Regions:
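Hydrophobic beta-strand positions that form the internal "hydrophobic ladder"
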Residues: 94-95, 145-146, 202, 266, ...
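Loop/turn-rich, solvent-exposed surfaces of beta-rich toroidal or solenoidal domains
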Residues: 315-323, 332-404
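Structural signature of eukaryotic scaffold interfaces centered on beta-propeller domains
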Residues: 77-90, 127-143, 185-198, 249-262, ...
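Blade/loop signatures of beta-propeller domains
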Residues: 26-62, 66
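Structural motif
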Residues: 102-108, 153-161, 210-219, 271-279, ...
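Blade-loop segments of beta-propeller domains
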Residues: 73-84, 90-149
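Asp-box/WD-like beta-propeller blade repeats and closely related beta-sheet repeat scaffolds
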Residues: 121-210, 230-243
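Blade-level signature of beta-propeller repeat domains, shared across WD40, Kelch, NHL, RCC1
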Residues: 411-454
Length: 454
């Protein structure tokens, strides 16, 4: 932890992160007790109206409504995967996903007033269509820049610059020398674009036509070139680093990938199995299977600068563990000692993209009922929260009720969240207690909401 602290204080330009590393509380106005706060019935406010959560007190704004995507009237909206940078590094821009056609829609944001507005070139509805495939990510260093894969060339890693409106290819991954060769075609695509804290390394999963079937993890270093790992054959190759067979016999398909802030590790998610950590400077792959009770690998998680956080449902729903990506068995319990009574019954998703800069900043998330119960019956039910990670204390900050109602038939009903790189704003999707209407028959709409974390 101390190494990450020294690194962050020397090079991270974001003021709030440095202040927390020096002992200043990041969220002085947030509730930190364990009292129960009932959820006050509340109609959904109009879009772009700032309001206060009536129970936990945070300022919020609704981003989208049924008119946000004119090409799909009454569309639903959700956050991108919490691994990507949904926010520009200066909080001036963010994007959401339009569920009907999968468009990435970017908006301007005023962090002082929490006003959402249209970017230059945006059409009716206010959302600027980002011409990249699903899951693009903002640069960690440049608020004008995004990384992703090209719409017409899904195996080409590209950049998009807002000021010019231009998409520029960085590398065609079919030229990376993968074995067997990646070949362009209608059944070959990619996803999961994430970047290291210096923007130098970019990772995607590639091959096949959907997540869960992809065989390749490709890391592109803007100075050294490509490096790849075929998860179905165990072969690693590329233009830098050692090549050969991986250190384990496991063979599998890739669900999702995420690169660490320091650029050394890639978390490779595998459906119903768990995940693997690849040290990209080596042939070393470390498995974290969900069936290994001792490793506590289950539950949603988040990758930071050089560490991983997850909540494996041990004793208490918020009982989270931090571990170095280079040693998954070296776990630190974030809430220690764990207070009683223990609370159970909530699932949770995590957001820690700001952790790619500094592993000491709080990890944030949202809780929701896995059976779609709209009621809140105990502390932390259906809330937006953050947990301290620096080891000094075990503070839990509480901000708002997210009013999401999970239904496994509709993936967008889960309150996936994303946090800004300075840790000041948390965005999430919610049906607002099923009050946003329906589309495509009886499918519940969801919109995107922003909470100010202070």
């Amino acid at each position: 932890m101390s190494c990450r602290l020294v690194f962050s204080m020397l090079v991270v330009p974001i003021v709030s992160i440095c202040l927390f590393a020096q002992g200043v509380q990041p969220y002085p106005n947030a509730i930190t007790d364990r009292q129960f706060y009932a959820k006050t019935p509340m109609a959904p406010p109009p879009a772009n109206t700032v309001f206060q959560d009536p129970d936990l007190g945070a300022s919020m704004v609704r981003v989208t409504d049924g008119n946000t995507n004119p090409k799909e009237p009454n569309d639903f909206f959700l956050n991108p995967d919490s691994d990507v940078n949904e926010w520009s590094m200066d909080d001036s821009k963010f994007y959401v996903v339009a569920g009907g056609n999968g468009a990435n829609l970017a908006f301007a944001f005023n962090p002082t007033t929490m006003t959402v507005s249209a970017l230059p070139g945006a059409g009716v509805g206010g959302g600027l269509v980002i011409p990249l495939r699903e899951g693009p990510t903002f640069s960690v260093l440049d608020p004008d820049l995004m990384y992703g894969t090209a719409q017409e060339a899904p195996l080409t890693i590209s950049t998009y610059r807002f000021s010019t409106g231009k998409t520029v290819p960085l590398v065609d991954t079919t030229t990376c020398g993968t074995q067997p060769p990646l070949v362009k075609g209608p059944k070959q695509s990619s996803s999961d674009t994430t970047v290291s804290s210096d923007d130098n390394r970019i990772v995607i999963s590639a091959g096949a036509n959907s997540a869960g079937h992809r065989p390749f993890v490709i890391v592109y270093d803007q100075k050294l070139g490509c490096r790849w790992y075929n998860t179905q054959t165990g072969q690693i190759g590329g233009q830098w680093g050692p090549t050969g067979q991986v250190s384990i016999p496991d063979r599998y398909n890739v669900n999702h990938v995420k690169i660490s802030g320091n650029g050394q590790y890639v978390r490779i998610g595998v459906a119903r199995v768990g995940f693997y950590i690849w040290d990209v400077t080596s042939l070393n792959i470390e498995p974290c299977p969900v069936q290994d009770v001792g490793l506590r690998c289950s539950g949603y998680g988040a990758v930071g600068y050089d560490a991983y956080i997850n909540g494996p449902e041990v004793l208490d729903e918020l009982n989270a563990f931090l571990r170095p990506l280079g040693d998954l068995g070296d776990m630190t319990q974030l809430i220690n000692p764990l207070p009683q009574p223990y609370y159970k019954g909530m699932e949770k998703s995590w957001a820690w993209t700001n952790g790619v800069l500094n592993g000491n900043v709080p990890v944030c998330g949202s809780t929701y009922s896995p059976v779609g119960n709209e009621e809140v019956k105990q502390p932390y039910d259906g809330e937006v929260f953050c947990i301290e990670t620096d080891g000094v204390a075990s503070t839990i900050w509480r901000f708002a009720h997210n009013r999401a109602v999970w239904n496994p038939k509709f993936y967008w009903s889960q309150p996936y969240g994303s946090i800004s790189l300075d840790g000041r704003f948390f965005s999430f999707s919610s049906s607002w207690d099923l009050q946003l209407g329906t589309f495509w028959g009886d499918s519940p709409r969801s919109d995107v909401w922003i909470v100010k974390l202070d």
